[in-house]
Amino acid sequence: MLLGCDISSISRIEKIYKKYGKAFLDKFLNSHEQALIKSPATLAGFFAAKEAVSKALGVGICKECSFFDIEIYKDSKNAPKLRLSARIMENFRIKTSALSISHDGNFAIAVAVLEK
């Protein structure tokens, strides 16, 4: 089992978004993920989630694992879920994944669990 955790400042992510707009979103979210963003808290949570997955893999965001190898979607109960690229699933031998995102005050935290 692989575990990764990340925390992001909602105000910091909001400040970057206000400065760069959609160009910032395009750096780490696909169009489906962008459609799910309803608030700065959600945006910070998605950023933290992708960082948490990359940490669980032990590589961070890099050539081996880009932001776009990790997709976040919502299930029928609006809970966040992960969809990893075939490249990640194969290279890291990942069988299942779980994701939790939470917000409190000015922070978003994400925990990713990957099972080999």
PLM segments and residue spans:
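Core catalytic alpha/beta fold that binds nucleotide/phospho-ligands
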Residues: 1-116
